[in-house]
């Protein structure tokens, strides 16, 4: 029997399916669920800006924070590929986006019946971040989407799900 589940999310539709399944399993077996998100520092800023717009992250974050999301589109003078180290403004925006993604996912999991839900974020390669969060949470199951937001990158470097599946020391459930 499983005793702790980690569900990884990047805010994509496939990740939402994984959250729903993980929440259902956590509720059924009455085990804790950790919702994990790897901050998206390696993602092109225009792609992040589009995601923030489509998912209404900008509006949600700006209700409580004073943030200039124009930095994602380049209007704020920055791009993730412009330097090897993102500016402090870019770090703040990506961190706030990550917090919003993980908090929405936790709310979704609770609404689906999970009773014990906590959250983690990581700043790492996506696969390594997920594996580290699973270890930190003491998870004996990882639930994640088959393919998230990084379709092009996964074609070049292999999918995050594939890497997690190959290196995890626990059960990995991949949702399509």
Outline where the language-model segments fall:
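Gly/Ser-rich helix-loop-strand patches that form or flank binding pockets
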Residues: 128-176
């Amino acid at each position: 029997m499983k005793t702790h589940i980690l569900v990884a999310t990047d805010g994509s539709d496939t990740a939402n399916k994984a959250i729903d399944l993980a929440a259902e399993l956590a509720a059924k077996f009455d085990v804790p669920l950790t919702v994990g998100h790897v901050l998206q520092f390696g993602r092109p800023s225009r792609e992040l800006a589009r995601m923030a717009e489509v998912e209404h992250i900008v509006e949600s974050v700006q209700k409580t924070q004073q943030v200039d999301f124009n930095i994602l589109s380049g209007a704020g003078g920055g791009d993730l590929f412009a330097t090897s180290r993102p500016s402090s403004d870019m770090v703040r925006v990506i961190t706030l986006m990550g917090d919003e993604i993980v908090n929405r996912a936790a709310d979704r999991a609770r609404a689906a019946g999970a009773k014990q839900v906590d959250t983690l974020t990581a700043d790492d390669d996506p696969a390594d971040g997920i594996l580290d969060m699973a270890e930190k949470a003491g998870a004996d199951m990882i639930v994640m989407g088959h393919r998230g937001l990084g379709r092009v990158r996964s074609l070049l470097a292999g999918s995050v799900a594939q890497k997690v599946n190959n290196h995890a020391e626990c059960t990995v459930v991949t949702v399509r």
